[in-house]
C-alpha cells in the first residue's frame, strides 16, 4: 500500500541538542512506519531543517499506532536526557520537499 504526504498526518515534534540523536530518530521513524512510503515519516528533518527550527524535528506517520510505536521504541533505545517530546497532533500532514 502506497501512502502520500497527506496520509502522514499523525505528527510528533521533539527537541534534541544532538544531531546524532536526530539521525537515530530518523532511522527509528522509518523503522516504525512499516507500510506505505516510510521516508515521508522523516521528511524535513535534515540538519538545515533541525537548525532552522531551533533544534526541533517533526516526524509524521500515516497511522496513530506507528507514532505510538515510535515513542515506545525511542524511549526504550535512547536515554531520556537526549530528547524530549514537545507536541503531538493528529491533523498535521506532511508536505513534499518542494513545498
Predicted features by range, described:
Residues 1-27:
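Short S/T/G/P-rich N-terminal loop/turn motif that feeds into the first structured element of a domain
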Residues 1-4, 41-52:
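Short, flexible, solvent-exposed loop/turn segments with mixed acidic/basic and small polar residues
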Residues 12, 54-62:
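Short cationic amphipathic helices and targeting signals
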Residues 17-18, 60-68:
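Helix N-cap motif at beta-to-alpha junctions
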Residues 18-44:
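Short amphipathic alpha-helix segments
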Residues 38-40, 78-92, 99:
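Conserved short beta-strand edge segments in small beta-sheet-based binding/regulatory domains
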Residues 64-84:
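An amphipathic, aromatic/His-enriched active-site/gating alpha helix that lines ligand/cofactor pockets
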Residues 67, 98-99:
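Catalytic "initiation/cleavage/transfer" segments centered on a nucleophilic residue
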